[in-house]
């Protein structure tokens, strides 16, 4: 199969904008659409019509907020003329059920759907250091590898079925959410005993309790007071809710997941909208005060 001749990109938000910017630096023409005008990166064609992206591109990347929006866009695309043979690569985090629904809609119209969420947050997207979790034909992954490598540091093929990419992404985000909340609680325990935060981090970083929160979020986002990891608390809470929903459907253990979901729901309720998820530390800190 030949490489795509034109790439489309739909959704230029927190993650989509930097990913599209790296694609625009490549050799394949890029056409972008977002409901907010003016977000297209330098080097890309911007259009105010989704239909123009679909008409001009043979591969279209999606980076959208949730499954409801992804499936609305999928239905709109499927109803357009001359879409057979096009490839839709959805990099949104929407859960297995929504991915399967989008796949059914688009494949019925003769298109190929790839379930390919990404991990690494906005900071990773800005550095092209994110990971793409690909569930779909390996041949399509190989055909698009030169595009993927423009904005991803890692690419994993996790299966051929829609929903498998979402499962891996959600379990990853659940682990990240758990590490962030548990580390915040543990650090507060150390602080209560008069140990300074940097010392706690230095010890744990080279011990068995190390994790990404201790390694990155605390020294770079919390100790500095910047709280700028680039991922909103409400979005992480959404992912934790999705994880718990599909754990229940799968019938696997949910003892820890249920409690973590309660914590992040409380965190979202305690913070203003679009607060960085690292501010979980501040929420828990306030709850430890007399």
PLM regions: where:
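Rossmann-fold NAD(P) dinucleotide-binding segment
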Residues: 50-112
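NAD(P)-dependent dehydrogenase/reductase Rossmann-like domain
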Residues: 270-290
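Rossmann-fold dinucleotide-binding core
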Residues: 93-173
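NAD(P)+-binding Rossmann beta1-loop-alpha1 motif at the extreme N-terminus of oxidoreductases
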Residues: 1-63, 91, 122
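Interdomain hinge/lid region at the active-site interface
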Residues: 166, 175, 213-275
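Active-site-proximal catalytic alpha-helix in oxidoreductases
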Residues: 127-128, 132-135, 156, 162-193, ...
């Amino acid at each position: 199969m030949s490489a795509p001749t034109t790439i489309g990109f739909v959704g230029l938000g927190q993650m989509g904008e930097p990913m599209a910017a790296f694609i625009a630096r490549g050799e394949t023409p890029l056409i972008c659409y977002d409901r907010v005008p003016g977000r297209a990166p330098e080097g890309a064609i911007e259009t105010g019509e989704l239909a123009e992206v679909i008409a001009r591109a043979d591969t279209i990347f999606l980076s959208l907020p949730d499954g409801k929006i992804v499936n609305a866009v999928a239905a709109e695309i499927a109803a357009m003329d001359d879409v057979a043979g096009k490839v839709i690569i959805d990099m949104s985090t929407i859960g297995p059920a929504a991915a399967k629904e989008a796949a059914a809609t688009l494949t019925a119209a003769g298109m190929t759907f790839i379930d390919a969420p990404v991990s690494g947050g906005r900071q990773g997207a800005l550095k092209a250091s994110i990971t793409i979790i690909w569930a779909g034909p390996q041949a399509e992954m190989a055909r698009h590898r030169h595009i993927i490598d423009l904005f991803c540091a890692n690419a994993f093929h996790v299966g051929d079925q829609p929903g498998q990419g979402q499962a891996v992404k959600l379990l990853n985000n659940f682990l990240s959410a758990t590490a962030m909340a548990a580390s915040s609680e543990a650090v507060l325990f150390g602080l209560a005993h008069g140990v300074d935060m940097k010392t706690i981090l230095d010890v744990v970083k080279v011990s068995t309790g190390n994790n990404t929160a201790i390694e990155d979020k605390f020294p770079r986002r919390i100790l500095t007071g910047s709280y700028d990891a680039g991922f909103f608390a409400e979005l992480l809470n959404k992912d934790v809710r999705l994880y718990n929903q599909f754990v229940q459907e799968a019938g696997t253990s949910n003892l820890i997941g249920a409690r973590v979901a309660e914590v992040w729901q409380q965190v979202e309720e305690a913070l203003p909208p679009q607060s960085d998820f690292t501010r979980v530390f501040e929420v828990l800190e306030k709850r430890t005060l007399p």
